[in-house]
C-alpha cells in the first residue's frame, strides 16, 4: 500500500476533515480512540494479509508508526 493510499484510509478511519500526514501525532487526535484502533487493525489485516496486534497499535505515536506496522 502506498503512503498516500494509507493516509487516505486513515483519514477515513479517523473521520477527519483536517489534513493528516505521516508525522501527525496520534495523541493530538480526539478521533484516535478504541473504535479507530479496531478499524485500523481490521483494515491492516485485510489490506496486507498481515496480523497486526492491538498492543503494537497502542504503542504507535504517529501515523508513520502505524504505516510501519504494515511492512
List PLM regions with ranges.
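Phosphopantetheine-dependent thiolation modules in NRPS/PKS and related acyl-activating systems
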Residues: 1-42, 47-71
Amino acid at each position: 500500500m502506498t503512503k498516500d493510499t494509507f493516509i487516505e484510509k486513515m483519514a477515513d478511519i479517523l473521520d477527519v476533515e483536517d489534513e493528516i500526514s505521516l508525522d501527525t501525532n496520534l495523541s493530538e487526535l480526539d478521533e484516535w480512540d478504541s473504535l479507530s484502533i479496531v478499524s485500523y487493525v481490521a483494515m491492516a489485516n485485510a489490506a496486507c494479509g498481515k496480523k497486526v496486534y492491538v498492543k503494537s497499535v497502542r504503542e504507535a505515536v504517529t501515523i508513520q508508526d502505524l504505516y510501519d506496522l504494515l511492512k
